[in-house]
Amino acid sequence: MLIKRWSISAALIVVLTAFLLALLHLEAPSAHAKATAPVVSPGSYGSGALGSWQRNDRVISNSPAVRETVKNNGVVLFGDSIAVQDGNALGRLVGQQLHTSFAQYSWAGQPTSAAVDAMAAWAREYGLPRRIVMAVGSNDIFDPPVFAAQVERALRIAGPDRTVYWVDVQVSRTDEPAAVQVADQRNSEWINLQLEQAALQHPNLRIVHWAEFLAANPDRLHTDLRDGRHTTVPAGQNARNTLILQAIRHS
C-alpha cells in the first residue's frame, strides 16, 4: 500500500536519490508561471523568500457547503496552489468513492500558518468534520523551522477525535538555478521530517506520502510534476488525489 509509513531514514534516502537522478536529466524550464516570485536572494535557507500571496487565486467553499460537510461528517481540505488546481477533482472523488460531502479552503501561495488560521476560523464558525486534509507545506520551504509549530497548532484545533491527513512535500523548482533546486529539495525533506516526528506523537495524524511516491520512480518527477512542484493534469493530479483517497479509506 503506497501510504504505509516509511522509516524516516529510508524515505529520505529514496527522495534524495531520485532527486539527484532527475537533476542529471533536467528538462527545460516549464512554460507555466510560478506561484511565487523568482528567487532574488537565497535567503536564510537557500530557497529565497515567500512572495506576496494574498491576491493569488483561491477556491473557498461557501457557507452552506461547509455546514453541509460538517453536518454529514464529510471531508474538508485546506490547501495551497496545488489544491487550487486539484481540489475540485478531489471533491468529485470524495463524492463518488466515499459518498460524502466535501468543502475546501485553498489559496495559492499560502504558507501553513495561514491555512491553520483558516482552519481555526472554520472550527469557530462551523465546527469541523472528523476527516481533515491538510495539503500545505510547499510554501514553507522558505522558512522550514516554523512548520512544526503549525502542525502542532493544527492538531490542537482538530483534537484527538478527528483524523488529519497531511500530504507531504516535494518541491524543487525547475526554473530556478541548480543551487536553489537543491535547497528546495533539502527544505522539503526538512518539512517532511517534521511531519514524521509529529506523527510519532499524534496517532490521529496520517501522512500521505506524495514525495515518496514520486521518488519511487524518478520519471514521475517529470510526468507527474510540471515545474518541480505543481501536478500535471491529469497524471499528477490523479496520482496525488488517489493517494489522499487511499489514506482516508484505509484509516
Locate predicted features.
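Acidic-histidine catalytic/liganding microenvironments
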Residues: 97, 161, 202
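Conserved beta-strand segments of alpha/beta enzyme cores
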Residues: 101-103, 163, 204-206
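Extracytoplasmic/secreted proteins, especially bacterial periplasmic and envelope-associated proteins
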Residues: 77, 89, 93, 131, ...
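Catalytic His-Asp segment of secreted/periplasmic serine-dependent ester chemistry enzymes
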Residues: 174-251
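Active-site segments of SGNH/GDSL-like serine hydrolases
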Residues: 139, 157-189
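Short conserved AdoMet
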Residues: 127, 159, 200
